[in-house]
């Protein structure tokens, strides 16, 4: 149920979090050049800008991670000037850009649930962990959570076996999430020059 999980709160599953001091601007953008099903990411002094291909060959979902101040500036631009800012950031790699949706922004935070299993309640994906979108790994981590849990439960039978599988899920997936959180922090600091 997402990063602000109501289930996690209802079952008193505490989290550790860290503010990345970055905001993400998300929008849908149409470009004059085809994306050829290729994702692009540019590393700017203020943070990365990712272009993720959508089914229409000219349409992308963008995620622009930047400082809170720069985020405010970008959101205040009219569509024409925002389009120019996106094109300049990409150095014209995708041709002309035209924003197709409302621009939305949210603060980026690392979240890590200290407990992922409570009885038969299991956290996974953004309810269990969020990381900086720098390398686009957040969704992949959530899919790995689901795949691992399905694999474990499909091999188990009985109440005791299921409890053992859930403990294994929590231990294994927490370790993988911790590795990715540390890696993203290192990459963020590397690209930020921190």
What residue spans do the PLM features occupy?
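Conserved FAD-binding catalytic core of PHBH/FMO-like flavoproteins
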Residues: 1-103, 113
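Alpha-helix N-cap/helix-start and coil->helix boundary motif
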Residues: 4-5, 48, 128, 174, ...
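Generic recognition of well-ordered alpha-helical segments
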Residues: 6, 24, 85, 145-152, ...
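Phosphate-coordinating loops and pocket residues in cytosolic domains that bind phosphorylated ligands
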Residues: 9, 118, 171
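Residue-level recognition of specific faces of alpha-helices
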Residues: 50, 115, 133, 145, ...
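FAD/FMN-dependent oxidoreductases across multiple families
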Residues: 70-161
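C-terminal helical "tail/cap" subdomain of flavin- and related membrane-associated enzymes
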Residues: 151-194
